């Protein structure tokens, strides 16, 4: 426990919280252009082909972002909107692409959780 005099000389240091999504620089979403669309395999106990896109953002960052839902229409030069949110079994993927905005189509035949996948209400 420091004395009052020691605290006057050198005050306590506040811990600095490190951002989990640095490329968004405090914005909820960011726009970017796909530079590469590919599939990756997840970490050890899981097995699949996860759809991922490399995106160059408007602020110059280049990040890997996950394409959620079944099927997508993305290719190189597609303009996408990304949000934060990591994929636990894909190391280095810390962002999600927002479905149903800009060049990203919503998921076809989606009945539940439609707002998360940019799907319109079925007739």
Curated annotation (Swiss-Prot):
Presence of the UniProt keyword rRNA processing in the record: no
Gene3D superfamilies reported in the protein's UniProt record: Nucleic acid-binding proteins (2.40.50.140)
Role of this protein: With S4 and S5 plays an important role in translational accuracy. Interacts with and stabilizes bases of the 16S rRNA that are involved in tRNA selection in the A site and with the mRNA backbone. Located at the interface of the 30S and 50S subunits, it traverses the body of the 30S subunit contacting proteins on the other side and probably holding the rRNA structure together. The combined cluster of proteins S8, S12 and S17 appears to hold together the shoulder and platform of the 30S subunit.
Family as reported in the entry's similarity comment: Belongs to the universal ribosomal protein uS12 family.
Keyword Ribonucleoprotein set for record: yes
Domain of life: Bacteria
Region entry Disordered, spans: 1-26, 104-123
UniProt name for this protein: Small ribosomal subunit protein uS12
Subunit structure: Part of the 30S ribosomal subunit. Contacts proteins S8 and S17. May interact with IF1 in the 30S initiation complex.
Residue positions, PTM 3-methylthioaspartic acid: 89
Residue spans of biased composition, Basic residues class: 108-123
Keyword entries, A-Z: Methylation, Ribonucleoprotein, Ribosomal protein, RNA-binding, rRNA-binding, tRNA-binding
InterPro entries: NA-bd_OB-fold, Ribosomal_uS12, Ribosomal_uS12_bac
Any single Pfam family the record assigns to this protein: Ribosom_S12_S23
UniProt GO molecular function: rRNA binding; structural constituent of ribosome; tRNA binding
GO biological process: translation
Entry GO terms, CC: small ribosomal subunit
């Amino acid at each position: 426990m420091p004395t009052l005099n020691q605290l006057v000389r050198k005050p306590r240091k506040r811990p600095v919280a490190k951002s989990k999504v640095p490329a968004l620089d405090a914005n909820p979403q960011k726009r970017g252009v796909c530079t590469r669309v590919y599939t990756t395999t997840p970490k050890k106990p899981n097995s699949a082909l996860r759809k991922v896109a490399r995106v160059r953002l408007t602020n110059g960052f280049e990040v890997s972002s996950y394409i959620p839902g079944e099927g997508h229409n993305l290719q190189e030069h597609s303009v996408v909107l990304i949000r934060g949110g990591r994929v636990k079994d894909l190391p280095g993927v810390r962002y999600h692409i927002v479905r149903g905005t800009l060049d990203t189509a919503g998921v076809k035949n989606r009945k539940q959780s439609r707002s998360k996948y940019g799907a319109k209400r079925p007739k």
